């Protein structure tokens, strides 16, 4: 290997596992096998993101991750989700403590909500961000607080069902929080500040159409870096839409077809002519009168 090849190798992002090796049998037997596989992968990574579609059991996965990582764990969730997570934990025989500040933390799994993060200083062994798409804002106060407060926490897990696949800001902020790289490092490595491009199929031929650059604020992935970008993402993030993505059966996870049944409601006392859409109801009081 010559010096230049060595130079290029050293430029490559390296993300090392900092977690623990476990066996699938260490996971709670109530979990599905695909969930156990994800838990095993995440515990081994130590710092990672789990982007699973709705209904695939992110809550059970994050709870098992916290249990197997050990020590003092803090789960941060939206206000409406915290107590729901406590109830879900009871289904797999785990006890969660709802805490409001750092003085209430105990050994084991603790949970709080995002509105209370000013009461914590990051003195935990592991941190879980539930609904981690809250990191999306590039300059948001909560995003900055989360990154700064928990920068030195060894074990980190992000969970959300809705990462924007074409939103470099959200992807970069997840990588920044997890300690993979900063948002700017990701942009400089894989993206270029240029007009976004869209592929259009016209009469069987593919064309590339350039879009707006919005005053220099738009970034697009470098064409030659696409494979490396997704290879890099797979080193710290797990994406899954259904169990078959990991080779398992989708039985029990396939939704029935959606049937849309229109219901026409006659509105007494309200008539409008020469309009396409009826807009004669003004406020709640009018809507209450509709019979």
Please give the residue ranges for each predicted region.
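Conserved pre-motif I regulatory segment
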Residues: 8-51
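Walker A/P-loop
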Residues: 45-65, 160
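Catalytic acidic motif of RecA-like/P-loop NTPases
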Residues: 55, 115-118, 132-136, 163
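Conserved Walker A/P-loop ATP-binding site and its immediately adjacent core
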Residues: 59-92, 165-171
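Conserved P-loop NTPase motor "coupling/switch" region that bridges the ATPase
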Residues: 72, 126, 143-245
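Inter-Walker segment of RecA-like/P-loop motor cores
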Residues: 93-118
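Conserved ATPase-coupling elements of RecA-like P-loop NTPase cores
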Residues: 120-122, 132-146, 167-168
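Conserved helicase/translocase motor-coupling segment
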Residues: 241-291
């Amino acid at each position: 290997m010559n010096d230049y090849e060595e130079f290029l190798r050293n430029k490559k992002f390296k993300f090392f596992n900092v977690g623990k090796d476990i066996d699938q049998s260490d996971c709670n037997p109530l979990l599905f096998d695909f969930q156990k596989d994800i838990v095993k992968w995440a515990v081994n990574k130590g710092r990672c993101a789990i982007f699973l579609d709705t209904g695939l059991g992110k809550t059970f996965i994050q709870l098992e991750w916290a249990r197997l990582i050990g020590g003092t764990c803090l789960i941060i969730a939206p206000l409406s989700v915290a107590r729901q997570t406590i109830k879900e934990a009871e289904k797999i025989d785990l006890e969660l403590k709802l805490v409001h500040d750092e003085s209430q933390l105990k050994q084991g799994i603790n949970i709080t909500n995002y509105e209370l993060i000013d009461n914590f200083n990051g003195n935990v062994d592991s941190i879980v961000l539930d609904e981690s798409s809250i990191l999306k804002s590039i300059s948001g106060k909560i995003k900055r607080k989360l990154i700064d407060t928990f920068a030195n926490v060894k074990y980190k897990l992000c969970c959300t069902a809705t990462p924007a696949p074409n939103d470099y800001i959200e992807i970069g902020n997840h990588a920044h929080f997890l300690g993979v790289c900063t948002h700017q490092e990701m942009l400089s490595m894989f993206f270029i500040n240029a007009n976004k491009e869209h592929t259009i199929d016209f009469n069987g031929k593919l064309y590339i159409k350039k879009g707006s650059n919005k005053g220099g604020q738009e970034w697009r992935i470098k064409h030659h870096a696409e494979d490396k970008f997704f290879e890099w993402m797979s080193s710290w993030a797990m994406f899954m839409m259904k169990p078959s993505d990991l080779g398992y059966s989708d039985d029990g996870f396939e939704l029935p077809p959606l049937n849309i049944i229109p219901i026409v409601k006659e509105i007494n006392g309200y008539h409008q002519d020469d309009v396409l859409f009826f807009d004669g109801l003004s406020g709640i009081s009018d809507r209450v009168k509709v019979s």
